[in-house]
A protein has these predicted regions:
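Small-residue helix/turn framework positions
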Residues: 1-163
């Protein structure tokens, strides 16, 4: 995250483990809430375990600026709209303190009133094949997706949306 504003934090550090009681900040057009632990007892393999709460962030900004988010769901880097999300997130960290992709385990909900998807090659091809032009640049409405990340692989429960 490149810029956090109006940060309020309560944390403690003991035995190479930061316990984050609460961090609240404004970022990427919305707000972020975070609590959990950052454990560096094994200095070669730090571990994070966070509860993350996102409200009304700009989708494209998050999925462009946060490398891990982009690697997990690259499709959303070109999406339009805002989203909210709650997520339990666990990961090992590398030497630069970035999550190690294949160690990420998480679950949560992705919620948005509307997500616009522009210039997605797969959707454009499907739109041509089924002769349904609305699929070329769809705008998905009233999204509530329950997702799971297991060892860095994202899956989602079936969900309904309107185009």
């Amino acid at each position: 995250m490149k810029e956090l504003k109006d940060v309020i934090a309560a944390l403690s550090v003991k035995d190479q483990k930061a316990k984050i009681n609460s961090i609240k900040a404004n970022a990427m057009g919305g707000s972020l809430g975070l609590s959990g632990t950052f454990d560096t007892q094994d200095t070669l393999k730090p571990v994070v375990d966070f509860d993350i709460d996102v409200k009304d962030m700009i989708i494209a900004k998050v999925f462009t600026d946060i490398t891990t988010a982009n690697k997990l769901v690259p499709l959303l880097a070109d999406a339009n709209g805002n989203f909210s999300m709650n997520m339990d997130f666990h990961s090992d960290m590398d030497g630069e303190l970035n999550p190690i992709l294949n160690s990420i385990n998480a679950s949560g909900n992705f919620i948005s009133k509307e997500v616009g998807l522009d210039s997605v090659a797969a959707l454009e091809k499907i739109a041509e094949l089924v002769k349904y032009p609305a699929l070329k640049n769809p705008s998905l409405k009233d999204i509530n997706i329950k997702f799971l990340i297991k060892d860095g692989r994202v899956t989602a429960d079936p969900f309904e949306t309107f185009i």
